[in-house]
Curated annotation (Swiss-Prot):
InterPro entries in the record: AAA+_ATPase, Adenylat/UMP-CMP_kin, P-loop_NTPase
E.C. no: 2.7.4.4, 2.7.4.6
Binding residue positions for ATP 1: G40, V41, G42, K43, T44, T45
Residue sites binding ATP 2 per the record: G1001, S1002, G1003, K1004, T1005, M1006
Gene symbol of the encoding locus: AK9
Binding positions for AMP 1 per the UniProt entry: Q87, S88, I89, E116, I117, P118, S119, R229
Location relative to the cell: Cytoplasm; Nucleus; Cell projection, Cilium, Flagellum
Family, per entry: Belongs to the adenylate kinase family.
Protein name per UniProt: Adenylate kinase 9
Amino acid sequence: MTSQEKTEEYPFADIFDEDETERNFLLSKPVCFVVFGKPGVGKTTLARYITQAWKCIRVEALPILEEQIAAETESGVMLQSMLISGQSIPDELVIKLMLEKLNSPEVCHFGYIITEIPSLSQDAMTTLQQIELIKNLNLKPDVIINIKCPDYDLCQRISGQRQHNNTGYIYSRDQWDPEVIENHRKKKKEAQKDGKGEEEEEEEEQEEEEAFIAEMQMVAEILHHLVQRPEDYLENVENIVKLYKETILQTLEEVMAEHNPQYLIELNGNKPAEELFMIVMDRLKYLNLKRAAILTKLQGAEEEINDTMENDELFRTLASYKLIAPRYRWQRSKWGRTCPVNLKDGNIYSGLPDYSVSFLGKIYCLSSEEALKPFLLNPRPYLLPPMPGPPCKVFILGPQYSGKTTLCNMLAENYKGKVVDYAQLVQPRFDKARETLVENTIAEATAAAIKVVKEKLLRELQARKQAETALREFQRQYEKMEFGVFPMEATHSSIDEEGYIQGSQRDRGSSLVDTEEAKTKSENVLHDQAAKVDKDDGKETGETFTFKRHSQDASQDVKLYSDTAPTEDLIEEVTADHPEVVTMIEETIKMSQDINFEQPYEKHAEILQEVLGEVMEENKDRFPGAPKYGGWIVDNCPIVKELWMALIKKGIIPDLVIYLSDTENNGKCLFNRIYLQKKSEIDSKILERLLEELQKKKKEEEEARKATEEELRLEEENRRLLELMKVKAKEAEETDNEDEEEIEGDELEVHEEPEASHDTRGSWLPEEFEASEVPETEPEAVSEPIEETTVETEIPKGSKEGLEIEKLSETVVLPEFPEDSYPDVPEMEPFKEKIGSFIILWKQLEATISEAYIKILNLEIADRTPQELLQKVVETMEKPFQYTAWELTGEDYEEETEDYQTEAEVDEELEEEEEEEGEDKMKERKRHLGDTKHFCPVVLKENFILQPGNTEEAAKYREKIYYFSSAEAKEKFLEHPEDYVAHEEPLKAPPLRICLVGPQGSGKTMCGRQLAEKLNIFHIQFEEVLQEKLLLKTEKKVGPEFEEDSENEQAAKQELEELAIQANVKVEEENTKKQLPEVQLTEEEEVIKSSLMENEPLPPEILEVILSEWWLKEPIRSTGFILDGFPRYPEEAQFLGDRGFFPDAAVFIQVDDQDIFDRLLPAQIEKWKLKQKKKLERKKLIKDMKAKIRVDTIAKRRAELILERDKKRRENVVRDDEEISEEELEEDNDDIENILEDEFPKDEEEMSGEEDEEQETDAIERLRGELGEKFEADTHNLQIIQDELERYLIPIISINGARRNHIVQYTLNMKLKPLVENRASIFEKCHPIPAPLAQKMLTFTYKYISSFGYWDPVKLSEGETIKPVENAENPIYPVIHRQYIYFLSSKETKEKFMKNPIKYIRQPKPKPTVPIRIIIVGPPKSGKTTVAKKITSEYGLKHLSIGGALRYVLNNHPETELALMLNWHLHKGMTAPDELAIQALELSLMESVCNTAGVVIDGYPVTKHQMNLLEARSIIPMVIFELSVPSKEIFKRLLLEKENEQRLPYPLHNSAQIVAVNNVKYRKNIGEIRQYYQEQHQNWYVIDGFHSKWWVWNEVIKNVQMVNKYMQTYLERIKAGKAACIDKLCITPQELLSRLGEFEQFCPVSLAESQELFDCSATDSLEFAAEFRGHYYKMSSQEKLNKFLENPELYVPPLAPHPLPSADMIPKRLTLSELKSRFPKCAELQGYCPVTYKDGNQRYEALVPGSINYALEYHNRIYICENKEKLQKFLRSPLKYWEQKLPHKLPPLREPILLTSLPLPGYLEQGIATSLIKAMNAAGCLKPKFPFLSIRRSALLYIALHLKAFNPKGSEYTRKKYKKKMEQFMESCELITYLGAKMTRKYKEPQFRAIDFDHKLKTFLSLRNIDPING
C-alpha cells in the first residue's frame, strides 16, 4: 500500500493517452543535422547514409537542382536553359532554392541534413552570413557532426582518388592501386593466421587467392580508364584546405562551442564512411532522438482491391499488407475510410484502396493521386487536431414549430458555425433577381414597341410624301390642260389619298385619348404586377416568355434608322408613353406577372452557393485549424424535389440532412407546440364555435319547449271539448247523426286553427299532408328558412340578445386536455392537414436525397429536450471520425491463429512453452487485451467490481480485445466504447476484496483480522454479521451450539423454580434468571435465524441486501474488505457469480482433521467439563430441594395421620372408656410409618441418575466424532464451493493452515502481495518482443520509444545513475507497454517491470547523461587494471591505456601521418613522445563507445608534462581515482603474481627492479599531479587500495555514482532553465572567476534577505555554488543554496532587492602591512571596536579597544575590531556599524606594562599560569618517582619536561624532542612499579622469572648516578 501511494507522487514519464501521444509526436520538431568538415572529408557520403537510415531530407545543391529540372518547374526550366547555354548557376539562386527546400513541407516533417553550408564561396554570402542563415532557420539544427581529419591524411586521400572517364565513378587509392591492394591482402592474411587449423587456413587461402586474382583483373581492366581530376591534384587540395582553415574553421569552432556538447558528434575522418555512419547511429540512439515517421504505401502495382469492398473487409485486407510482425497489424485510424486531405479542406470523400498508406501504425485512405502527394510529403497538417472532425455542412428540415431553428442555432454554437436562413438570405435575393428579370423584359418589350411604332410612322410619312408629289404633278398637268377630264385612276387615287389622310388624322386624334388611358392602365398594371411578383414568387409557372427576337430585330435595323435620320426629324418623338407603344406592351405587362427564369431552381441553387461562399469566407477563422469549407447550417430550406436536384447538380451536398419528426402518439408533441404557439387564436375560434353551438342548442330547446307547451294546450282544449261533447251528448241523446257530424267538423276546425297560427314557417300544408307522417329529412330541408325568419323577428330585440350572449359566454368552457397534449377539436384540422402534406412531400424528397448518398438523420422530437437532440446530432456527426468497436468474429480468430502459427515457426522457444501450457492458454496469454485486461469494462465502470469477462463475449476496440460479462454489457460497450476505456490515466482499480473460507477451526478469522489490520481494510465475519442482526431482539446468539445449551439450561431453571415454589425456598438470582419474553422477528430475521439454526443457505433476496452494502455502498465500497466465512454453501457461491459480486480472490485455508482436533477439542472438553459441573450442582440442588419437599410432605402427612389416630382414639375412649396401653401406641406409630413409607417411597431415579452420567472418555470420543463429521461436511462443501468459484473464473488461493500462525500469516501475505503491491497495474499488460522487432517498430514508428530511451526504468527507480550499454554480454530485453517500447537490461528487471509497469513509469524522467570519463592512477600492482576491467564489464565503458591507444592507431590507421611518425620513433628504438601519445589517445577517445558510455583511462597521466598535455587537449576526466597502496604490499602482490603466472616464451616486464623504479617514479610525480587536480578541478579521490578488490570496487562505484548524479542533475536543471549546483563539475577557479555573476563572490541570498555582504571567497570549494543564466553564484550555506536553487529569479537582477555596492563601498580587510601603509591615517572611533559598541547599545561598558590584526577599511576609513567574529559582522553589515560617534567620556587608555616588572606571583599569573596549572595537574595525576631521585625532584623534573613539551611558542622540533624525553622519563618511573610487583623475597632462577624482568632490572640499576634529562 505504501509503495502504491509513493508512485502516485510523480506524473507519468510517458503520456498515457494514445491520442495525446500521437498529437505530441505530430507537434514535435523533426531532428535536423548539420555536417561540418574540411572539403573532401566525406560529408556528402555520410549524409547519404544518414538520409537512408533516418529518412531526413538531404539539402544539397546538386540534388535540388536535379529535382527542379526533373519537375520542370519555372526555376527548373530556367536552370536547364542556363546549363544548356553553358552558363554557371549563380550562388544566389542556389541559396534561394536551398532555402525554399529547407522551408518546404517535406522538410518540416522529415527534417534535413546540410553539408554544404557554409561554403567556400564568399560571393553571395560571407561565412558569418551563412552561419546566421542556419541559426535563423525555422527548424534549428539539433545535431552537429564534425568530421576531423589531419591535413596530411586528407590531402593524401584526395590526391589518391581517380575517376572513371566513362562512368564518372570515383575510386580511392585502395581500390585501384595494386601495391596498396597487395599490402592490405598481406596484413589481412597475417591477421587470420592466428587461431586456425591448417586445413581451414589452406581452404581460405585458396578462396582468397581466387578472389584476389579476380580483383586484380578488374583493376587491370579499369586502370587505363582512370584519370585524375584537377581538383584532386595535391597542390590544389592543399590550397583548398588552407582556404577552409583561413575562412571557415574559426567560425565553425565558435558555433560548435556554443552548441550543446551532448549533441555535438566528433568523428575521425580517417575511418571509412560505413564505420562513421555506425558511430553516428550509436550516438543518436544514445541521445534518444526520434527519427522521422515514414509512410508506407499499403498496395503495390500488382495488387488490386475492389473499390466497392466493404469497409471492414477492406481494413482487414490492408492491415495485412507489409506486416510489421505477427500480431502487430496496421490499425484503423479515426478517419476510417475518409480522406484526411479532403477532410482538412472540409469535404468528406471516401478514400480508395489504391491510395492507402500506413503512418504511425495506422491506415489512411486517400481519395486521389493529388491528395496522396501532399500527404506523403507531410501528413502532419492533415492529422493534427481538430482533425478529424465534421466540416459542419448540415441541412435541418422539419415541420413548423418542430424546433429546427433552435437546433440550428445550438448546432452552430457548438461548431462555431453560422446559420443560413433560406427564407431570409436566399429567397429575398431570388425575388430581387426575378424583379430585375421582369424589369428587363418590360424594358426590352418597350424598346421593341418603340421601334415598331417608329417604323410605322416612317412608312406613313413616306406615303404622305408620295401623295403630295402626285398631287403636285396633277396640279401641274391641270394647269397645262385647261380642259380635260381627269383619269379615273388618278381621281380615285387622290380621293383615296385624301380619305387616308383624313382617316389617319382621325386615328391620331383617337390615339391621343387611348395613349392617356393606356398610360394610366400600364401604371396600374405595373403596380399590380409588382404586387403579384411579391405574392407569387414561390409558384412555378408552366410557360416562360422571352423577347430575344425583338432585341435581334432591333439590332439588325440600326442601319435603317441611320439611313432615315433626316426624315425622322419630321416625325414626332416616340417614347414609352406613346399610345401605340403603350397599347403594344399592354399584353407584355399582363404576361410579365407570370414571368420567371427558365430554370428557377438552378437560380435558387446558384444564389445559395453564393450565400454559402460568403458565409464560409466570413467564418473561415471560426476556430484554429478549421477546414476551408463548411461551418454552415441551412434552415427553412424548401422541400422541393427539383430544388434538391439542382443543389446536388451544383455540388451543394450536405454531409448530413436532419429531419425532425413527431411520429409518436400521432404527433401529440408537435400539435401541442402548435397549440401553445397559437393558443389565443385557436381558443377564440373554439369559443366562437362553442357559442354558436350553444346558441343553436338554446334555440332548439326554446322551440322544443314552445312546441311542448302548444301540445299541452291542445290536449287541454281537446280534453275540454271532449267533456263538452259528453255533456252535450247527455243533453241531446236524441240528436241526429248529422248534428253529430257537424259537431265533429267544428272540433276539427278548432284543432286546425291553433296549429296554423302557431306555424311560423311561411308555408301551408294541404290537409292530406297533415294527417300523414313527416319524414326525418324535412326539418333539415326547411331549417334554413326557419333560421332566417327567426333572425328577422329577433333583430329588433338587440338588447335582449346581447344579454343572452353574455350569459351564454359565461357558461361556455374550453375543452379539457392533458398538459402535454392538445385539444382534439376541428380548429386543429388545418394544422394537421398542413403537417400531413409536409410529411408526404418529405417522403418523396427522402428517396431523392438517399439516392445521392447523403446521410439522413431522423430525429424524434417527442419527450426530448433541445440539448438531447443536439447531443444526438453531434454524436451522429462525429461518430464517423471516432474509433469503432466491433464484435469479435471468426475472421478475428482466424487472424489470431495465423499469427500464432507464424510466431511458432519463428520462435523455437514457443514449442517448449507449449509443452507446459496448452495452445488455447498460450493464445490467451499472447492476446493484446484492452484497458481492463480480462475484466469486464462495463461492470467496472458501473459497479466498480472486478468481474472476469466471458471469452465468448468479446469485442475489439483499437486492436485490443475486451471481454464482457454478458451480451448486454457488450452491446453497451459497442455503442459507446470510449466511455469504458482509459484516457489520460489508467482505470482506477477497486480496493482489495477477498473471500476467506475454510473449515471451522482452520484459523481463518485470526488470519483475516491480522491481514485487514495490515492492509487497513475492513474485516467482516459473515456469521457474526448475521448474529448482530438478531442480537438486538434475541439478546443471545442463535445456532445449534448455542440453542442446545440454552434449552437444557432453561428446562433446568424451570424445574428449579417449580421446586423452589413447592419448597417455599428463594433461589439465588444467577440460578433463577427470568425467561426472556418472546420477541416478534421480521420475515427477514426469521429467514436469517432459520439459516443459522438449520445450517441452510440464505435466499438470494437476503443475500442481495447484505452483500450490496459491502460491494456497492460507501465506505466499504472504496476501502475494501476481507470477507471471513463466506460463501458458506455452493448456492451462496453461485449467487456471487450470478449477481456479479466478484471478489479479487478466494482464499482457502486447508487443514487436516487432526489439526482441527488439536485446536477445537481442548476447548470443547473444557466446555463439557464446565457444563457437567453446573449440571451436578444443579442436580444436587434439585435433590436437596426434593428431599426437603419430601420431608415437609411426610411431616404434614404424619401430622394428619396422628390427628386421625388421636380422633379415633378419643372416639374409642369415649365409647369404651378404656385407657390405651403403650403397646397400642407403638403399634399405631408403626402403622403410621408403614403408611408413610408406602405413600412416599424413595426415588429410584436419583439413585440410578448418577450411574447414567456421561464419562469424560466417552465425551471426548463423542466430541471427536462430532468434530470429524463437521470437518468432513465442511471439506466436502468447500470443494464444491471451490469448483463453483472456478467456474466463475474467480482466482483461488490455497493456504496450508496446519503450520504455525506466523508462517500461515506470512504465506498469506506473500500470496496476496501481487494483488496489493501491483494494484495500480492490475489492468496493465506488457508484451516482450525481440530486439530486432523493437528496432523495426521504431523505424516504422509503429510504436514510440519511451522517455526512458535505453535506460532501464527498474534500475533507474532503484537509484542507478549509469546508463546500461547493449552488447553481446549485456543484451537488452524490449517490452511493449501501451504505445511505448521500454528496454530492460536483464530478465529480472523485465519481470519486475511486466508485473507493475505503472510503478516504474510513474517516476521522474531520466536525467541527461554525458559519457563518463574516469582516470585510475596508482603505483604498479595497486589494482588499477582490475578496477578498470570491472567497470568496463559492468557498465560497458571502454578500457583504454596509453599503450592500447598507440596500438589502435598503428593497427587500424597505418597510413596516417600519426602512425608513420610513431613507427619512425619505434623503429629507431625510442619511446613514443608524449605529444604523439596524446594524439593517439585523442583519436581513441573519438570511438563510439567513448562518446556514448564513456572511457576508463588506466594509469595515465604519471608525469606533469602528460598532465599538461591532457589539459591542453581539454581531456578532463570526470573523476580521478588514486589507489593508495604501501610499497610493501606492492612487492607482496608481485611475488604472489609471479608464483601463479604461467611460463611464457618471452620475458615479462614485471621484475622487482622495474616495479621498484616505476614505484619510485610514480611517488615522485604523483604529489604534484594530485595537487593540481585537487586545486583546479576538485575531482581527485584517494581510495585505500590495501583493502579487498570488492571493497575498492564499491568505493569507486559509489563515488562514480555520486559524481554522475551531480552531473545529471546539473544538465537537467540547466536544460529546464533552472539554477543548478556546479559542485563536482571540474570547474577551474579561473573559469569560476570569468563567469561570476553580478554579485561576484558575495552571497546573493544573504544580500537579498538580510542585506549582508557575505564574502564566499575565503573557500575554494564549490559545494554551495550554482549556475543560473550562464553565470556563477556562490552561497554561504546549504540553506542559502537551496533557496537560490528553488527561486533564483528572486536573488538576481532585475528582481533582486539590493544590488551589490560598488567596489569602494565594500569593506575590505587590511593586513598588518596594509594597515602600516595607511599611516598616518588614524583608526575611526579611536581604535574602539565598532561592532562591540553597536551591539552593546552604545553603552560605556561596550567600549572595547580593537586588535590591529582585525583591521578593515570602509568608506576610506579604517576600523579596528575586537576579534574575528566582530570583524566578520562588520564586513557583512557595514552600514550598521560604520557611522557611530564616541561619547565624551572614554575609559582610560590601556598602556602596556613590562612583564618583568611585575612581582613573581603576577609574573607567573600573566606569563605561565595556564601552562603551569596543566603541568602540575598532570604531575598530580601521574605521581612520578624517578629511580634514585626524591619525589620532589622527580615531580619538578616532570613539570619542567611538560612545560617544554607543550610550549606554544616553542618550535615543532623542540616540542617533539621534549615529548620524547617526557615519555622516556615516564617509562623510567614505571620501572619501580613493575619491579615492586614482580620481585619476590625469595630468589628465583632466571628460567622462572618474567621475560623482560632482567632487562628492566638492569635498566633500573643503570639509572643510578645518571642525569635523568641528558643521560
